[in-house]
């Protein structure tokens, strides 16, 4: 079941639906058109007694919490979130699988790329400064930033950061935040912002700077995007559907990582030299093997 963002190309919903369909020919996708649809759509799903109901994104955390308690003999999966009760508290349920990700891993990889671009002064990267815009504080967002900072510093220890947090999802407002960071020297803007990503990335494009996306491949938004830190929603959903088909559904937290092929960085743009890509791939192999463990906690001073 999608959130209200619909099945637009490149969206979280579209990627998740593709993963489900790749794992089972009998998948039915139900689109939600507004947040007010969530609870009713989940109840209608329950009436059909499906083997598994997958809800996409944290937007449905409370609706899943309510519905799963009413239908404890049915199985649910909540993508990229944990059920949240009516008091706003995360809650584990015995019939809900929380499909989560190690955001610090893709954050680290794109951080390495950004750090090397600054170190080598590739193209417009001349100020040794990276910009970050986050929607707000939270475990996933903090992990993205922590990994990004660690990755960049692993190859460019003296690189500087400009970090801004915004509760606003207005693209125009986030564009202004990007303009401010660029005015302060930021060459590459890394967004973990949600719906206002397009505005922040536009700021990079207008200034002939660079941008890095998150969650899905955001190259479609602008030529300024040089890569994206990707959570492979399709892979996580496909593995969960396969697990149900094999009769081995497991409730609770499932954290997907590089070892599951559920983390990636998108194909870099032509601005990124091959030697930098090769170094990022080496870091990726080191994370997969356990030689490198990217941190999930933002360091002091960031």
Report the location of each language-model feature.
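A residue-level marker of the well-folded mature domains of exported/periplasmic proteins
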Residues: 1-302
